[in-house]
């Protein structure tokens, strides 16, 4: 796990390139520690109208990797023998944090509920502490965060 200080420094460095940190995950895959940093050109709290033409490029990922790698090697003693991956959050990204929900307002989402049912609709509204609302095309439904097991953006052509 990264310290709050290190995460803040990563966010500052990405901002110098006009990029934002969407998420930072630390996990093991095939017994290898991986630090995955997801970046975007859009600030996490910006609304739907800021999406056009803001795709992350391979060059953006490389630039962020080159900026933060020395920082991680020096500042965070908890990281030893890890692999750094920098990428976009993807088209069908999982929404985990309140800012992810706000970032995805107006997009089609799939919600897997605790009872294992799945509902799709347009993410309509977010109350950061309590619930979200989606427009299914027939009605607007609200769900508490406690009722949701997983929510992700659904890519459509």
From Swiss-Prot:
Tell where it localizes: Cytoplasm
Task: Keyword check for Transcription regulation, yes or no.
Answer: no
What is a single Pfam family found in this protein's UniProt entry? Answer: RimP_N
Give the keywords, sorted. Cytoplasm, Ribosome biogenesis
Give Gene Ontology CC terms: cytosol
| Superkingdom in the source lineage | Bacteria
The cross-references to InterPro entries, in alphabetical order and at most eight, read:
Ribosome_maturation_RimP (IPR003728), RimP_C (IPR028998), RimP_C_sf (IPR036847), RimP_N (IPR028989), RimP_N_sf (IPR035956)
Q: What does this protein do?
A: Required for maturation of 30S ribosomal subunits.
Of which family is this protein a member?
Belongs to the RimP family.
User: What HAMAP family does the record tag this protein with?
Assistant: RimP (MF_01077)
Record's protein name: Ribosome maturation factor RimP
**Lineage of source species:** Bacteria, Pseudomonadati, Campylobacterota, Epsilonproteobacteria, Campylobacterales
Q: Which gene encodes it?
A: rimP
